């Protein structure tokens, strides 16, 4: 999609991105893993275009000395998995499982339904 932000650092700049609509009769909220969708998209881009400059190297949110993707994801795990040509989706499951389980335990007391 194309959009033009009305505030913040990209105000009045034509930007583009991807929007995924997860809906429909077969949609399963408990099974849908949006982080994994974008991780697999990165992996597909890397496989199809191995020389593509996927990781931007400018400072992000005042975090100097780290790649923005590592800041956003809390570490280099996603980037390293994406760049490893031998890494599989099953490896991503192992990489994400501990954090997902910890998050599930933290959020449980706050769920209302």
Q: Where are the regions a protein language model picked out?
A:
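Conserved functional hotspot residues or short segments at active or partner-binding sites
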Residues: 1-93
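C-terminal regions of mature proteins
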Residues: 79-113
């Amino acid at each position: 999609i194309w959009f033009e932000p009305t505030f913040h650092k990209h105000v009045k700049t034509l930007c583009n991105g991807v929007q995924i609509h997860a809906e429909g009769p077969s949609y399963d909220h408990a099974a849908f893993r949006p982080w994994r969708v974008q991780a697999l998209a990165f992996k597909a881009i890397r496989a199809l275009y191995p020389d593509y400059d996927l990781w931007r190297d400018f400072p992000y949110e005042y975090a100097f000395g780290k790649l923005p993707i590592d800041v956003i994801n809390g570490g280099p795990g996603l980037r390293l998995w994406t760049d490893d040509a031998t890494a599989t989706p099953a490896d991503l499951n192992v990489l994400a499982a501990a954090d997902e389980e910890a998050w599930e335990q933290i959020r449980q007391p706050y769920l209302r339904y």
